[in-house]
């Protein structure tokens, strides 16, 4: 029974409503096991006509969280190609026996990224220590493989049911194997922000992720990654998303663009 903002208990001290953290807690909230969430989404494009392209993008994330620690796994993959006329030595389009232009598929994007994070909550569960290891490849950016490892201190700045914000500050080591350009490695500082807001009675989720690796020996070669999007639940665990991202690589290979900007519309499954 609730009377004047207090829970009245038989043969026990009364409790103010703000003293009740969790009603009907799940097992993980009592210290048993993990609370597992995640999603897998894809964006597929198939164009035929004046523009003939094929694009595939896959993105996956899963988070296992307990009262003691949190494990985050992320991966994404992008592949795209375009059909272009096959030409002879004089630059003229080749044709088949029926007079149709012969076209060949040429790749225009081929990149992937995997990342794993481990966070250990301290005595104040809003604070945590963490390790982050990641690998990526982008052949068209001349990156055969880039690996990085970071150690950081993090804090949950906001932990409301409808608004969360985590901030992390740490150190990193980055090693890049280029396809053509001379390989590079450096140590740096990391500043990361992760936020989510539930809008319109949790019918829409606004999410934001900012990951920065500051090259302490040459700041103009730093890496900045920003992602902002909206997720909309559909039915039976399906969801749609609209997402904008900007990746700035100050240490890009010579002749390659430092800034990649994308706008994606996704559909996927969440659990």
Regions flagged by a language model, labelled:
Residues 40-42, 73-75, 129-133, 151, ...:
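Membrane-embedded beta-strand positions of outer-membrane beta-barrel proteins
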Residues 16-23, 30, 76-192:
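Outer-membrane pore/translocation modules
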Residues 67-73, 124-129, 160-165, 198-206, ...:
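Repeated loop/turn-to-beta-strand initiation elements of outer-membrane beta-barrel proteins
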């Amino acid at each position: 029974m609730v009377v004047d903002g207090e829970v009245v208990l038989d043969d026990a001290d009364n409790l103010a409503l703000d003293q009740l953290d969790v009603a009907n807690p799940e097992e993980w909230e009592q210290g048993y096991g993990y609370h597992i969430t995640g999603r897998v989404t894809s964006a597929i494009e198939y164009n035929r006509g004046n523009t003939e392209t094929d694009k595939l993008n896959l993105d996956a994330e899963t988070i296992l969280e307990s009262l003691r620690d949190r494990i985050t796994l992320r991966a994404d993959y992008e592949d795209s190609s375009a059909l272009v006329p096959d030409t002879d030595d004089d630059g003229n389009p080749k044709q088949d026996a029926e007079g149709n232009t012969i076209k060949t598929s040429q790749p225009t994007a081929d990149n992937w990224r995997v990342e794993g994070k481990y966070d250990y909550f301290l005595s104040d569960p809003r604070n945590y220590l963490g390790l982050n290891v990641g690998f990526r490849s982008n052949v068209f950016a001349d990156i055969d493989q880039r690996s990085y490892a970071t150690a950081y201190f993090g804090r949950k700045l906001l932990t409301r049911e409808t608004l969360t914000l985590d901030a992390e500050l740490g150190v990193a080591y980055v090693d890049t194997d280029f396809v053509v350009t001379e390989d590079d490695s450096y140590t740096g500082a990391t500043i990361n922000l992760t936020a989510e807001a539930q809008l319109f009675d949790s019918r829409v989720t606004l999410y934001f992720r900012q990951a920065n690796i500051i090259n302490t020996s040459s700041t103009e070669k730093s890496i900045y990654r920003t992602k902002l999007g909206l997720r909309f639940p559909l039915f039976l665990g399906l969801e749609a998303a609209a997402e904008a991202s900007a990746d700035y690589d100050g240490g890009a290979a010579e002749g390659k663009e430092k800034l990649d900007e994308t706008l994606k519309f996704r559909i996927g499954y969440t659990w």
